[in-house]
Amino acid sequence: MPEGKKVRIRVRTVSCVYVGDFLVPPMRHRVSDAINEEPRLFISLTDVLINDKDRSDFVAINKNLIESVAEL
């Protein structure tokens, strides 16, 4: 099992809203710290609800498409 803290977040992109679990690595304390890491081009969500109707086990979202992120 991966180490870190699982956080439920809402990610709003240009075309969709995703609500899913994001794993914050142990060396990071905040969601924003993990998302803003330079080498990271995508963020991964698990147990995802897409636009309040569709479900997916996993989604990778290109950071360049993200408009906002909020912890739930």
What residue spans do the PLM features occupy?
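Conserved RNA-binding domains used in RNP assembly and mRNA/RNA metabolism
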Residues: M1-L72
